[in-house]
Each structure stands twice: as structure tokens, then as C-alpha cells.
């Protein structure tokens, strides 16, 4: 099965950059598996939010990539942005720890919302390795082929762009390092921010390090303070 490019609802610069992926047979297989999954049960996020990260952060605006694993699998959580939940939804433990690190790193007080749209609009691509998941079943769509697609996203960004900061937290994210040209981009690694993860996330200072790198390469730093974002 081949996907009709006109049916792919994604921001135009990404549609052009990823055209070869959308027209490939594996992407058609992803679509078929999604159709079957939706017939069998609930899929997160809603269809209109699957490409939310791309729609909020056009290809040429990407400054930072924060790689997650797969969407949250509880009701009303997933919004197509890694680690992010809609305003009003309880902030997940991993994001609580991210906020704690930002406070320790930059002195920014922890916000009341888990919505990371403000970061996305500044050029932070909040990318999950898998873009969909079945309700209450973590990693249930990991065999759909999404990682072929998101690996291609990373490779294309690495090849076509310069001076992007890749924040890779946890071993699955660190496994993506070979996809990135480290001569022209900055890769920062740490343990996953989940309370269940082993290793050090706290003290990584990735947020100040990111901004230092961006500033050194004549790019506007990220305002990590979500308290400045009006929902």
C-alpha cells in the first residue's frame, strides 16, 4: 500500500523534507496497521495530533530535538509532543523531574502545566520514536515501523541542517547517536528523567548547555520558562 501524499496532513516544509518516507512502502504499512489498531481499540494521540511536533516546529526552525520513546497511553494525555501533556492534565513523573532539573540549572520555578507547546514554537522538536500507542499499552506500536520513520527524521535533520542540539535521555535515545553527525551538531546524553530509571539525570545541566551552544552559533537561546506561556 502506498500513501497518497495529498492525504498526509503535516506542515509543508516537513512534507517536502520527508516526501520519500511518506511514499515508501513501509509508511503505507504503518497506515494499514494504524487502521487495524483503531478498529480494535483506542489509539493515542488523536489522528489530528500525530504530527503535532512537526506542525508546531517547521523543518527550518528546529534548534533542539528532545527524543522520547512513545506517547503517553492514558486518557487525555498524549498530544503528539514528547513528554508533554495538555494543560489541566496531571504532570507525569518524568516531566516533574525535567522541571526540577530546569529549576536547579536555571532557577526557573516549576510551572503548573505540562503543556510544552511554548518550547515547540521556539524550535524544540519534541519527537517520540513511535508516534502512536494503544490505550493502556506502553510500546504497543513499537513494531509498526514508526522508528524507521523517526530515524529518517533524525538523519535528514543531521544531514540538511547545522548546529542542532540533540538531547538524548535514556538508552533507547542514546542508541540514535550513530544517526547524527556529531561534527556539525551537539549531542547531550543523560539517564532518562523517569523516577524508575537508573543513572544520573539530575545535574546534567542540559538546558543551560543547550543555550550556551545556540548562542555560540548565533542562534536565539530557548526560553525554557513555561510560566511565560499563556495557554
UniProtKB/Swiss-Prot annotation:
Alphabetical list of InterPro entries matching this protein: UDG_fam1, Ura-DNA_Glyclase_AS, Uracil-DNA_glycosylase-like, Uracil-DNA_glycosylase-like_sf
Principal localisation: cytoplasm
Catalytic activities: Hydrolyzes single-stranded DNA or mismatched double-stranded DNA and polynucleotides, releasing free uracil
A cellular-component GO term for this protein: cytoplasm
Principal EC category: hydrolase
Keyword Hydrolase among record annotations: yes
Superkingdom in the source lineage: Bacteria
Subcellular locations according to the entry: Cytoplasm
Family: Belongs to the uracil-DNA glycosylase (UDG) superfamily. UNG family.
Role this protein plays: Excises uracil residues from the DNA which can arise as a result of misincorporation of dUMP residues by DNA polymerase or due to deamination of cytosine.
PANTHER family reported for this sequence: URACIL-DNA GLYCOSYLASE (PTHR11264:SF0)
Annotated protein name in UniProt: Uracil-DNA glycosylase
Source organism (scientific name): Campylobacter curvus (strain 525.92)
Amino acid at each position: 500500500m502506498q500513501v497518497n501524499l495529498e492525504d498526509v496532513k503535516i506542515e509543508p516544509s516537513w512534507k517536502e523534507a520527508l516526501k520519500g518516507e511518506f511514499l515508501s512502502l513501509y509508511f503505507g504499512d504503518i497506515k494499514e496497521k494504524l487502521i487495524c489498531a483503531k478498529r480494535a481499540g483506542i489509539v493515542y494521540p488523536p489522528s489530528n495530533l500525530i504530527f503535532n511536533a512537526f506542525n508546531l516546529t517547521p523543518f527550518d526552525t528546529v534548534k533542539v530535538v528532545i527524543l522520547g520513546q512513545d506517547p503517553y497511553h492514558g486518557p487525555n494525555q498524549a498530544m503528539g509532543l514528547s513528554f508533554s501533556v495538555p494543560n489541566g492534565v496531571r504532570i507525569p513523573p518524568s516531566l516533574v523531574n525535567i522541571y526540577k532539573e530546569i529549576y536547579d540549572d536555571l532557577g526557573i520555578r516549576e510551572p503548573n502545566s505540562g503543556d510544552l507547546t511554548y518550547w515547540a514554537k521556539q524550535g524544540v522538536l519534541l519527537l517520540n520514536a513511535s508516534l502512536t500507542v494503544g490505550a493502556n499499552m506502553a510500546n504497543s506500536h513499537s513494531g509498526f515501523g514508526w522508528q524507521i520513520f523517526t530515524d529518517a527524521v533524525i538523519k535528514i535533520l543531521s544531514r540538511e541542517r547545522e548546529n542542532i542540539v540533540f538531547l538524548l535521555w535514556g538508552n533507547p535515545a542514546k542508541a540514535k547517536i550513530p544517526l547524527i553527525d556529531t561534527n556539525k551538531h551537539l549531542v547531550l546524553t543523560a539517564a532518562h528523567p523517569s523516577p524508575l530509571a537508573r543513572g544520573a539525570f539530575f545535574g546534567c545541566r542540559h538546558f543551560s548547555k543547550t543555550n550556551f551552544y545556540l548562542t555560540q552559533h548565533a542562534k536565539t537561546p530557548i526560553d525554557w520558562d513555561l510560566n511565560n506561556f499563556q495557554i
